Amino acid sequence: MAVKIRLARSGAKKCAYFKIVIANNCSPRDGAFIEKVGHYNPMLPKDNHERVILKTDRIEHWLSHGAQPTEKVINFLQQFSITLPLAIQKKHNIKLKNYVAKPSKKSK
């Protein structure tokens, strides 16, 4: 069973609110989850400390058991200075290198 750390949408229409959950890879986005480990409210200002709340101890537990975070969750984990396993760090760095523009070969 592959486990992911991902966002599950909730809230009213045009007023999104996301739960950060541990869920089975096969379950739907807003479907059943194993554990809620935080929440994200994009409606709050970026400098508000309540915009992203994480249970760091539980996230570290699930990462040590092989849970794979999504790209957005990786960004949140980096904001909270949570160390990721080496395999996830390598995978994330490879994706960042793909977005770097290559210099043009025209020298004239």
Swiss-Prot record:
<dbReference type="InterPro" id="IPR023803">
    <property type="entry name" value="Ribosomal_bS16_dom_sf"/>
</dbReference>
<protein>
    <recommendedName>
        <fullName>Small ribosomal subunit protein bS16</fullName>
    </recommendedName>
</protein>
<keyword id="KW-0689">Ribosomal protein</keyword>
<keyword id="KW-0687">Ribonucleoprotein</keyword>
<dbReference type="InterPro" id="IPR020592">
    <property type="entry name" value="Ribosomal_bS16_CS"/>
</dbReference>
<dbReference type="GO" id="GO:0015935">
    <property type="term" value="C:small ribosomal subunit"/>
</dbReference>
<dbReference type="InterPro" id="IPR000307">
    <property type="entry name" value="Ribosomal_bS16"/>
</dbReference>
<dbReference type="Pfam" id="PF00886">
    <property type="entry name" value="Ribosomal_S16"/>
</dbReference>
<comment type="similarity">
    <text>Belongs to the bacterial ribosomal protein bS16 family.</text>
</comment>
<dbReference type="GO" id="GO:0005737">
    <property type="term" value="C:cytoplasm"/>
</dbReference>
<dbReference type="GO" id="GO:0003735">
    <property type="term" value="F:structural constituent of ribosome"/>
</dbReference>
<dbReference type="GO" id="GO:0006412">
    <property type="term" value="P:translation"/>
</dbReference>
